[in-house]
């Protein structure tokens, strides 16, 4: 009996403890559900008021052009009332004394998006100031241009200061040619009228030997004025009309020492192209022409094997008509001596 009583007592205590725990957990969840919306609302409200404060500060600095003078003063009063309410709820975002004393009449509203508080309020309009300043600058610039000394620019980087008329008239009184004229457009330090490969043109007669005219453009040494005196050196002076490879003109382009019209292999012209010492018309193998091509020392018409013509092709020293085995002709096929011995023997017996 006592054991059963103890078991029932333990079961009852466990059920009571579990019921109490569930009630406590339910109360905590309900309290959390009530406090979380309140905290979220305060956070959202603080964020919104922070944005309003920043927007007003930007408007006071004149960095937003969305607000204009056409707005009603009632809107400004509403904004100030919101700011005061936000200040009372959030003392950490409190304004300083100057901002607290600020009223709707003292609030500065920009009239232009480029308005700045640091600028002084002058009675002159900005457009008039800008026009007067531009006129002043243009006048000073025109005076500077009139007072500036005239100069001319040359392509080689030289500048000429002074009177332009004197430059256009010619050289200096002493005859020096340091100043170049404008109509002599040039490449580098040379005049365009004497475009050439070499040194630049000089006006003095002492430099005649170094002048190279365009009419005698050449590859080689330059042309001298005393060409007739040095005619013996004509191989060293080549004009454009005699462009060449070597020491002869282009009209006789050649391989060797003969003109192009006699192009050849060896010492004879192209018209007698040959293999050896005879012309091409007698192409041959050896010392005879092509018409007598042969194997040996006789012409092609008598092709042979040995020293006799092709018509007497033979094996040995006799003609083809007496083909034989050994030293006797085919008509007397035999195994023994030759026909000549038989003839000699018959003559001896007679």
UniProtKB/Swiss-Prot annotation:
Keywords: Amidation, Cleavage on pair of basic residues, Neuropeptide, Repeat, Secreted, Signal. Residues 22-40, 120-136 have a biased composition (Polar residues). GO terms for biological process: neuropeptide signaling pathway. Residues 1-22 form the signal peptide. InterPro entries: FMRFamide-related_np (IPR051041). Residues 22-49, 115-140 are annotated as: Disordered. PANTHER family: FMRFAMIDE-RELATED PEPTIDES. This is Myomodulin neuropeptides. It comes from Lymnaea stagnalis (Great pond snail). The lineage of its organism: Eukaryota, Metazoa, Spiralia, Lophotrochozoa, Mollusca.
């Amino acid at each position: 009996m006592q054991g059963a009583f103890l078991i029932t007592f333990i079961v009852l205590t466990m059920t009571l403890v579990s019921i109490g725990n569930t009630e406590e957990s339910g109360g905590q969840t309900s309290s959390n559900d009530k406090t979380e919306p309140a905290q979220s609302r305060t956070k959202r409200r603080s964020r919104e008021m922070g944005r309003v404060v920043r927007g007003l500060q930007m408007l006071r600095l004149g960095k937003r052009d969305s607000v204009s003078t056409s707005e009603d003063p009632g809107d400004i009063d509403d904004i100030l009332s919101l700011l005061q309410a936000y200040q009372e709820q959030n003392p950490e975002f409190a304004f300083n004394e100057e901002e607290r004393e600020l009223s709707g009449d003292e609030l500065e509203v920009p009239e232009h998006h480029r308005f700045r508080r640091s600028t002084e309020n002058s009675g002159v309009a900005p457009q008039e100031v800008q026009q007067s300043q531009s006129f002043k600058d243009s006048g000073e610039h025109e005076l500077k241009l009139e007072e500036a000394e005239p100069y001319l620019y040359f392509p080689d980087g030289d500048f000429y200061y002074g009177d332009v008329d004197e430059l256009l008239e010619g050289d200096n009184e002493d005859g020096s040619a340091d100043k170049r004229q404008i109509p002599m457009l040039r490449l580098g330090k040379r005049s365009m009228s004497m475009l050439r490969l070499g040194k630049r043109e000089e006006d003095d007669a002492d430099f005649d030997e170094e002048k190279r005219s365009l009419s005698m453009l050449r590859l080689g040494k330059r042309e001298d004025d005393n060409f007739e005196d040095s005619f013996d050196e004509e191989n060293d002076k080549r004009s454009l009309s005699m462009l060449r490879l070597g020491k002869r003109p282009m009209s006789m382009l050649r391989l060797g020492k003969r003109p192009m019209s006699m192009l050849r292999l060896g010492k004879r012209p192209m018209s007698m192209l040959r293999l050896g010492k005879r012309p091409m018309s007698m192409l041959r193998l050896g010392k005879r022409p092509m018409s007598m091509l042969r194997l040996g020392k006789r012409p092609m018409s008598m092709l042979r094997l040995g020293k006799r013509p092709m018509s007497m092709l033979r094996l040995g020293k006799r003609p083809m008509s007496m083909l034989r085995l050994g030293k006797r002709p085919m008509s007397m096929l035999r195994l023994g001596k030759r026909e000549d011995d038989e003839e000699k023997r018959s003559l001896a017996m007679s």
